[in-house]
């Protein structure tokens, strides 16, 4: 359908809530809660906070890179804090062709970004083994993508904060979650001179929502 229509435009409405367990706070104690808000940019074309269950203490401005609605309330046992929000996505259909790739690629999004996007000797050697003599940037990216997605096993991860170098951690056992595989892809692409950047966020379905 996306190919036929050239893309897709979808409006999402989302309910999010948080309930604090009764043994975590005492009645009257200050409860501080952040609930995430969508950020306009990339494929997200509009976003709005429709309503909240309680008055918000602060709503992050639209230009914040990671937006939340913040509540500061006296705790009552069993209380639930919630928000209703909406956002619109425009996702164009894209089918890249290797023959259209320019030989000269931009230099932005090709640099190291410690501590995880680091061009270690091990990663340099592995990248050379994966891409071989390929010079086309799109085909390099495809080789890296195929290596990661066909050789790896999906596994849940410990907190990223505890991992010194995510790509090397992942490649040492070829096990990791979607974020680990993504940052490894970004690192190997950049190492090969292919511009790549990270994108993450909330995905929603009619019956569930999660981070991806």
Please provide the spans of the model-predicted regions.
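Intrinsically disordered, low-complexity N-terminal segments that are enriched in acidic
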Residues: 1-94
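Solvent-exposed loop/turn segments at secondary-structure junctions
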Residues: 90, 151-154, 177-178, 203-206
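Acidic low-complexity segments
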Residues: 61-172
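Active-site nucleophilic cysteine motif
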Residues: 137-144, 174-189
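Short intrinsically disordered, low-complexity coil segments enriched in acidic
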Residues: 2-5, 153-154, 212
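Generic recognition of flexible, low-complexity loop/linker segments
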Residues: 19-22, 130-133, 174, 185
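Hydrophobic/aromatic-rich core segments of domains that either
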Residues: 179-212
């Amino acid at each position: 359908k996306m190919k036929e229509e050239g893309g897709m435009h979808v409006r999402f409405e989302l309910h999010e809530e948080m309930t604090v367990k009764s043994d975590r706070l005492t009645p009257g104690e200050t409860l501080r809660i952040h609930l995430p808000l969508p950020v306009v940019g990339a494929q997200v074309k509009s976003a709005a906070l429709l309503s909240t269950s309680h008055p918000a203490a602060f709503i992050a401005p639209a230009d914040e890179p990671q937006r939340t609605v913040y509540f500061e309330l006296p705790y009552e046992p069993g209380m639930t804090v919630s928000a209703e929000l909406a956002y619109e996505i425009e996702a164009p259909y894209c089918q890249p062709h290797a023959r259209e790739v320019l030989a000269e690629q931009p230099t932005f999004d090709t640099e190291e970004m410690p501590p995880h996007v680091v061009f270690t000797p091990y990663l340099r050697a592995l990248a050379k083994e994966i891409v071989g003599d390929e010079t086309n940037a799109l085909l390099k990216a495809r080789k890296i993508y195929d290596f990661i997605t066909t050789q790896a096993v999906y596994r849940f991860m410990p907190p990223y904060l505890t991992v010194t170098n995510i790509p090397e951690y992942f490649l040492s056992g070829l096990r990791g979650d979607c974020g680990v595989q993504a940052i490894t892809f970004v690192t190997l692409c950049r190492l090969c001179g292919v511009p790549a950047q990270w994108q993450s966020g909330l995905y929603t379905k009619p019956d569930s929502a999660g981070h991806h």
